[in-house]
Amino acid sequence: MYQPGILVRRKRVWKPWTVALITVALLLALAVLIGLLVYFLVYDEKTHYYQASFWIPSINYSSDLSKEQSKFRTGLKQKISNEIDVIFQRSSLKHHYVKSQVVNFRPSNDGVKADVLIKFQIPRKNAGTLKRQADNILQEKLQSSQSILKRDASLPYLREMNAAQAEHILNSDCGSGMEYPPIARIADGKPADKASWPWQSSLQVEGIHLCGASLIGSQWLVTSAHCFDNYKNPKLWTVSFGRTLSSPLTTRKVESIIVHENYASHKHDDDIAVVKLSSPVLFSENLHRVCLPDATFQVLPKSKVFVTGWGALKANGPFPNSLQEVEIEIISNDVCNQVNVYGGAISSGMICAGFLTGKLDACEGDSGGPLVISDNRNKWYLLGIVSWGIDCGKENKPGIYTRVTHYRDWIKSKTSI
């Protein structure tokens, strides 16, 4: 029988190069630890939000300042933001200043008052000091005769605000999506970038995507009426927000569904509905509303527009997990009503968009989703709602969309938006 071996312990002798290697490794680890400690003590920055109120004696309050898309309001907001940008970008806080945004105008006995939200990135240990610096910088610069802004003495100057509430306010303006993006597609296409289309939502039954929709207020969506042909009970529906279906930013239950009174499932007219969420969403960079155009808003044939959704990538094709986008063109109703296209089926409440050559188009599952256009300020407006078509990307069969301007008064009557 074999006997087990005898364990003999030997004294380990470290070679010089091994000792040197271990020493270097320990010194490197110590250096990294010290570096991290210094970073978190000195450079670790936190976002801080401050609300400031200003008095503008040179401007009289007008009702246009309460109208979201009025030129007077948008122009004055931009002028104020530009002045605050210049003040901080030319100051000792230029590396900490992020942005400012006017959130409200108020009437005053002798002018206008403006509430502004200002965003900074500040090292944690210096927050109090830099807040005082910001206060002093504003006071000094606003004393200049060149400034249209004066301090509103009736309120504390810089009031700190909760981050979530501040982001909600900063993103409360409608239609701020990405910069005009490059060509992409739904059919045959490319996924949309994160935060490209923050108003896009998914209408789902039992967790399955059925239709798209557009966020037009913190508690309201607009979509196609035909999405509810088979499932009319609001309790069956949930709404998902975010670029991917599998990992949404947030979800909401549906409180109510209002379908246009004249809609009938056997025809395409009046294919519009609004959906009220069970509770409001909190706006953020990745989740906020699209602008609704005035009823008089005009768009010309050949104008570039975008349609987005989680519909099929091609006729009878697979459905994506990530939001898709496609750039197409407006086609006049006269062209779309030609015999070889839709032969007179396009009414004044519809928009025709795509290409007569086919290929680029919305598809099954995109119903209810947005057709949007950008203005020269990079504000995105909801022109249409994916409604119907023949196949996907078929020659002489572009997509047909519910014309939002035609139903603008109806939307307002149901949502007060």
Curated annotation (Swiss-Prot):
<dbReference type="InterPro" id="IPR036364">
    <property type="entry name" value="SEA_dom_sf"/>
</dbReference>
<dbReference type="InterPro" id="IPR017329">
    <property type="entry name" value="Pept_S1A_HAT/DESC1"/>
</dbReference>
<dbReference type="InterPro" id="IPR000082">
    <property type="entry name" value="SEA_dom"/>
</dbReference>
<protein>
    <recommendedName>
        <fullName>Transmembrane protease serine 11G</fullName>
        <ecNumber>3.4.21.-</ecNumber>
    </recommendedName>
</protein>
<keyword id="KW-0865">Zymogen</keyword>
<feature type="disulfide bond">
    <location>
        <begin position="211"/>
        <end position="227"/>
    </location>
</feature>
<keyword id="KW-0735">Signal-anchor</keyword>
<dbReference type="InterPro" id="IPR033116">
    <property type="entry name" value="TRYPSIN_SER"/>
</dbReference>
<keyword id="KW-1133">Transmembrane helix</keyword>
<dbReference type="Pfam" id="PF00089">
    <property type="entry name" value="Trypsin"/>
</dbReference>
<comment type="similarity">
    <text>Belongs to the peptidase S1 family.</text>
</comment>
<feature type="active site" description="Charge relay system">
    <location>
        <position position="271"/>
    </location>
</feature>
<dbReference type="GO" id="GO:0005886">
    <property type="term" value="C:plasma membrane"/>
</dbReference>
<feature type="disulfide bond">
    <location>
        <begin position="363"/>
        <end position="392"/>
    </location>
</feature>
<feature type="transmembrane region" description="Helical; Signal-anchor for type II membrane protein">
    <location>
        <begin position="22"/>
        <end position="42"/>
    </location>
</feature>
<keyword id="KW-0472">Membrane</keyword>
<keyword id="KW-1015">Disulfide bond</keyword>
<feature type="domain" description="SEA">
    <location>
        <begin position="46"/>
        <end position="165"/>
    </location>
</feature>
<dbReference type="InterPro" id="IPR001314">
    <property type="entry name" value="Peptidase_S1A"/>
</dbReference>
<keyword id="KW-0720">Serine protease</keyword>
<feature type="topological domain" description="Extracellular">
    <location>
        <begin position="43"/>
        <end position="417"/>
    </location>
</feature>
<feature type="domain" description="Peptidase S1">
    <location>
        <begin position="186"/>
        <end position="416"/>
    </location>
</feature>
<feature type="active site" description="Charge relay system">
    <location>
        <position position="226"/>
    </location>
</feature>
<keyword id="KW-0812">Transmembrane</keyword>
<dbReference type="InterPro" id="IPR001254">
    <property type="entry name" value="Trypsin_dom"/>
</dbReference>
<keyword id="KW-0325">Glycoprotein</keyword>
<dbReference type="InterPro" id="IPR009003">
    <property type="entry name" value="Peptidase_S1_PA"/>
</dbReference>
<dbReference type="InterPro" id="IPR043504">
    <property type="entry name" value="Peptidase_S1_PA_chymotrypsin"/>
</dbReference>
<dbReference type="GO" id="GO:0004252">
    <property type="term" value="F:serine-type endopeptidase activity"/>
</dbReference>
<dbReference type="Pfam" id="PF01390">
    <property type="entry name" value="SEA"/>
</dbReference>
<keyword id="KW-0645">Protease</keyword>
<feature type="active site" description="Charge relay system">
    <location>
        <position position="367"/>
    </location>
</feature>
<feature type="glycosylation site" description="N-linked (GlcNAc...) asparagine">
    <location>
        <position position="60"/>
    </location>
</feature>
<feature type="topological domain" description="Cytoplasmic">
    <location>
        <begin position="1"/>
        <end position="21"/>
    </location>
</feature>
<dbReference type="GO" id="GO:0005576">
    <property type="term" value="C:extracellular region"/>
</dbReference>
<keyword id="KW-0378">Hydrolase</keyword>
<dbReference type="GO" id="GO:0006508">
    <property type="term" value="P:proteolysis"/>
</dbReference>
<feature type="disulfide bond">
    <location>
        <begin position="336"/>
        <end position="352"/>
    </location>
</feature>
